[in-house]
Regions:
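N-terminal export/targeting and maturation segments
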Residues: 1-3, 25-31, 80
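Surface-exposed polar/charged interaction patches
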Residues: 12, 16, 20, 35, ...
Length: 88
């Protein structure tokens, strides 16, 4: 995937996730690695762009194995998840 195609993919992914649930965003291993066949470098770039986007919109952003609290419950970004972002 070219750099331009990857940015277009990332913007589309962000928009679709926000439409699904604007308060809780989840990127899974399956959707990035299996379904869209992204390389590790492409996944890193998608996560970097997404992190910047969501942090600029006041989301809390967490990556694989990170622990966090959401709706008064302790949670963890599981190994089959790349990223979780949310705002309360």
């Amino acid at each position: 995937m070219t750099e331009k195609e990857l940015k277009k993919f990332t913007i589309g992914l962000i928009e679709s996730k926000e439409k699904l649930n604007e308060n809780y965003i989840r990127y899974s291993y399956y959707e990035l690695k299996v379904k869209n066949n992204l390389s590790e470098e492409e996944i890193d770039e998608v996560l970097k762009i997404s992190r910047n986007y969501f942090e600029n919109k006041a989301y809390s952003v967490y990556f694989t194995n990170a622990e966090f609290e959401y709706k008064n419950a302790k949670r963890k970004v599981e190994t089959n998840e790349y990223m979780i972002a949310f705002k309360e």
